[in-house]
């Protein structure tokens, strides 16, 4: 069994780390390099950088700060933001990223997943899915362009169907961004995660809702996710990664200790 992963998430806007609640009302929380370095030294297993303003503005993530990050940290990191072509993906990997993640561009052109997987290998290709629970219809729906609340919209895809489809196209890993829980610190949506896990044969990363050590434990133990991604609790130093890993280890979760 592979060790479970603790993954700080850094949302980037205008070259600063920002954070909102339910993908809205973003505020600046710090410098990209400073936070990346802090998390790498504190025992994070990898980092994820989402340039959330790139796709809505028809731009591509800034490769300059990717190169700078690669020079100051020694753990794997994944980058997302407006990656629409194989050429762009290659440039980002050449700048030092270990993986690339696509979200809205994959919804527009699903064949992009297959093209990236065929040329770069599935291990490099992550598909990030912004999933929203519609309480009226009682279904989970996929949203796109969520980095800009004025452009965000619900797609025709239900979340489980999209999870199945991206695997067919060659996604090597799936990050499930649970929008209803994002920034709320009330725990991950375990029901949704358990259901997705039944149909997900690639590594599954939970994102959205972490507020306590127990929430991480529940995601690993009860939903069998491969990694737990969080932002607010790390940015605001509510949870210390080293102590979190010690807790998980004592609870029987296989984890890489700092």
UniProtKB/Swiss-Prot annotation:
Keyword Ligase: no
EC assignment: 4.3.2.10
Pfam families: His_biosynth (PF00977)
Gene behind this protein: hisF
GO cellular component: cytoplasm
This protein's name: Imidazole glycerol phosphate synthase subunit HisF
Pathway participation: Amino-acid biosynthesis; L-histidine biosynthesis; L-histidine from 5-phospho-alpha-D-ribose 1-diphosphate: step 5/9
GO molecular function: imidazoleglycerol-phosphate synthase activity; lyase activity
SUPFAM superfamilies recorded: Ribulose-phoshate binding barrel (SSF51366)
CDD domains xrefs: HisF (cd04731)
Primary localisation category: cytoplasm
NCBIfam families the record matches: hisF (TIGR00735)
